[in-house]
Structures are given as structure tokens and as C-alpha cells.
Amino acid sequence: MKWVKRIALGLAIAFLVSTVVNASWLAAPPKGYPRLLAHRGMMQQFSRAGLSDDTCAAARIEVPVHDYLENTLPGLQRADGLGAAMIEVDIAATADGQIALFHDRTLDCRTNGTGEVSKATMAQLKALDAGYGYTADGGKSFPFRGKAVGYIPTLEAALNAVPTVPLLYNLKGKTPDETPRLITALKAAGRDVVKVGDGFSAPDSELAAIRAAFPGVWAYSEDSIKACTKAYLTSGWLTMTPEACRNGTIAVPLNYQWAFAGWPNRLIARMEAVGGHVIVTGPYRAGSAMGLDLPEQIGEVPSTFNGVVWVDDIWTIGPALHPATNHRNAREEAETAAALEVRRKARE
């Protein structure tokens, strides 16, 4: 059947042309280098299997190989020391008008407190044990209990702890005034978020206020990332950058790099031309971390990539990219290696 052969030939030619015109080498190598974004700073790793918004992540951590907790000053500073070029922090408004760093809507999972974070004053939060609820054995032992009293920090303390490190402020809309309070707090602290290179992850409803307060700042929502990424997966092969990516953000999972036209150099050039940003994430699959959490994964990031690499385990990824930051002793090396093997086998 000649018409079938003609269609097949036409499709083959179209595919070849599309591949050639989108070749990465057609764009000059971008300036810069991969920038590690440490998710919550240094944090304890936990199982994502069956994870939901109501799951207590602190109750399912892996056997700890370090003593750092997420959204704490020691955790932020250690992430900085391990080569994080940016740190994601979780924003929570308190009952007395302050901004704290805390991931959950309620205190019950991680701390010895109860109720909503927004109903507690900063003084009440500082009195809590931030490591109270962490367990790796179903509640038989709690390795951080009693060791993190007073560890829930204010935003101001975090800014002072890592003053030159760009922060990605994660707003979940826990309270209606979360965004205006954060804006006020940043301005009161004299933080030049654009100059420092800060960013904002927030619900769509909050982006306009953030961009109005800080013109030119990097700001995105989960929905806007999905829109840009999905649109580019089709229009990119037609050599077009979709409108959804203008001043937007695209996410490239490690295991789907092949699906993005012009990856990496051509895609980066296209996104830069429309004021966009590019994030490399961990493999896209059920039960996996959003960010990189195995040291070998950093080798899958193209050497010419100059955007953000989302990292869940900066303890291992940092030294994998920046060997000079590795100051683990022999015991820590052995425990880390064992933990990584358990993590790998869990995904087989």
C-alpha cells in the first residue's frame, strides 16, 4: 500500500527535521553552572509511598545519618556549607503577626504541640520541641526528641543566618494574610529579594501581589509550572515557546529529558528569551522524591545546564557536585552509604 509508505516516509522526514531544528548544539552553551536548590535546607529523608497532604512525614523517616532538621537555622547553614546555591523554606504566619519557618499546617506531627501553627504566637512556637515527632521505627524510638527545643525560627533569624543565600519562599495559603505578612516582613528586614535572587512558590491567587511588591522577582505556582511544562512538550518541537512559559518556569524531570525539544542548550535559550526559568527535578514516578536524592543522579544533569536543580538530599548531592564540601567522618560515610543502598533497593 503506497499511501501507507508515503505517510510513514513523511512522518519520518518530519521527525528528522524536527530533531535537527531543535538540536541543542544550535544554541551557544549557556553561561553559568547548575545551582543546587536545597529543599527545606537540610532535612531528614522519608518514604513518599502513599504520601498525602494528611500524612505525617516525620513518622516515616529513614534511619538518620545526620542530626539536622528541616526549616531550622542549623539546617539552613549546613545546606549552605554543602554547596546549596538556593534554599527552599516554608512560610507560616503566627498568631502575633510574625513569620515563622514551618512546613505543616498543624503542630501535631513534628512537635510536642497541638493545633494550627497560625493559632500559636512566636513565643509559643519557640517553646516547642521541633524534633519531638520524628521516628524511623514506627514510634519505638524518637532520635531527635529533646534535642530541638526552640528550633522553630523566625523569618528574620533565617535571613540573618544565611544572609547572602537566595531563598525560595514556599507559601501554601495556610492563612489569608500569609502573603501580605511575608511581603511586609521582607521589606521591614530590608531584604532586596530581586538583587539577592530570592524566589516565591505560591498559589496562583497570590502571584500578582508578590510581583507587584517585588517587580522582576521569580515567582511561580504549581499550576503555572504544569501549564508551561505541558505546553512546551508539544509546541517546543515546533520551535515555539508557548505563552504559558513567558516569565514562567518549566520543570524537566531527570527521566524525561529526552521529551523536551532542544534540551538542554536550545531550551534554556528559549526560556531565557521570554524571561523564564528552568528547574531540573528528580525522576517523575510514583513514590519518588521531587528532588534529587541519590548522588549518582547529579551525573544525569547536563554539564551545560545553568538553572536550578531541585535537591531533596543535599547531604549527599552537595558533595557529589562539590567534593570539597564533604567533611563526613568515617562513621558518617559508612552510615550514609548504607542508607543510600536501602533507598536504592526500595525503588527496584
Give the residues covered by each predicted segment.
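Phosphate-group recognition and catalysis centered on beta-loop-alpha active-site segments
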Residues: 2-348
